């Protein structure tokens, strides 16, 4: 299937590592020109060079912090200058650590506020700055990366920020839909990224068991019985970013391998 992404311009926040990196790679592989944004310059530039070398597509690294209005404004401005516009926005930036289930007395309000600022308000800032460009073109795709803890209790911070992102997405989808702009949410499950792979290696060494054992125990608790990887998420996001996904708007897509005994409707 030709996803018709050649010639499209995309911004991927949180694009230097993990799921964001995989998404940027797939978009470039399908022919999109991509700008990736993150706070760490070294990893960002290395990722941009790697993706560009592997896809023969231009990848622009932009140091940016979605928690800051001025940084987001400058990021979008530079991306538009370099790419000639913005057709696709993937909001993948997030603070690490929201999966930790702190007891109620130990929840740090400042940490909570920081996570909301980066992920939820950060996504809002990015959307506010790219939407006018998409409206002028009469076409756009915005994909917000949330997470399965929007559907499951266990982390107050993680659940709250992801539910907020879902609610915001639906409201914005209703507003931007008449302009030809689709806005969706993707819920990755526990995904075996570089960071989690390193953690699994440390756990395996500590327990004296094979790495595969730890990975299957921690990441294979889905119906498929295998870990979800960043590329699994990237395939779905890349489709949602394409003209082929016109019928999907304001909706949530889970990429978690299927949670046992759960029914979502």
Where are these regions (language model features)?
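Short C-terminal tail/terminal secondary-structure segment
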Residues: 18-19, 96, 101, 238, ...
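A short, exposed helix-loop element centered on a Lys and neighboring polar residues
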Residues: 127-128, 170
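Substrate-binding pocket helix/loop in short-chain dehydrogenase/reductase
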Residues: 100-104, 108-113, 142, 218
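Short, small/polar-rich loop/turn modules that mediate ligand/substrate recognition or access, typified
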Residues: 177, 182, 248-250
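The beta1-alpha1 cofactor-binding region of Rossmann-like NAD(H)/NADP(H)-dependent oxidoreductases
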Residues: 63-75, 109
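Conserved glycine-rich cofactor-binding loop
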Residues: 9, 16-18
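Catalytic loop of short-chain dehydrogenase/reductase
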Residues: 95-96, 109, 141-165, 169-178, ...
């Amino acid at each position: 299937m030709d996803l018709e992404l050649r010639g499209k311009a995309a911004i991927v926040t949180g694009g230097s590592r993990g799921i964001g990196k995989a998404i940027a790679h797939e978009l470039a592989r399908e022919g999109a020109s991509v700008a990736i944004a993150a706070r760490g310059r070294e990893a960002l530039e290395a990722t941009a060079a790697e993706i560009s070398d592997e896809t023969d597509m231009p990848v622009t690294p932009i140091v940016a912090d979605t928690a800051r209005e001025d940084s987001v404004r400058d990021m979008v401005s530079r991306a538009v200058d370099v790419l000639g516009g913005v057709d696709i926005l993937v909001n993948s930036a997030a603070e690490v650590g929201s999966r930790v289930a702190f007891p109620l007395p130990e929840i740090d309000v400042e940490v909570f506020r920081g996570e909301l600022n980066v992920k939820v308000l950060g996504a809002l800032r990015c959307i506010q700055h790219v939407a006018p460009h998409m409206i002028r073109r009469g076409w756009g795709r915005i994909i917000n990366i949330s997470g399965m803890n929007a559907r499951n209790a266990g982390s107050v911070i993680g659940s709250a920020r992801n539910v907020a992102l879902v609610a915001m997405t639906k409201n914005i989808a209703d507003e931007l839909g008449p302009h030809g702009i689709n806005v969706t949410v993707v819920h990755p499950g526990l995904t075996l990224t570089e960071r989690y792979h390193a953690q699994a290696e440390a756990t395996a060494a500590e327990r004296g068991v094979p790495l595969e054992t730890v990975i299957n125990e921690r990441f294979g608790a889905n119906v498929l019985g295998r870990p979800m990887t960043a590329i699994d998420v990237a395939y779905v996001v890349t489709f949602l970013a394409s003209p082929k996904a016109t019928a999907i708007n304001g909706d949530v897509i889970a990429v978690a391998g299927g949670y046992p005994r759960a029914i979502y409707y």
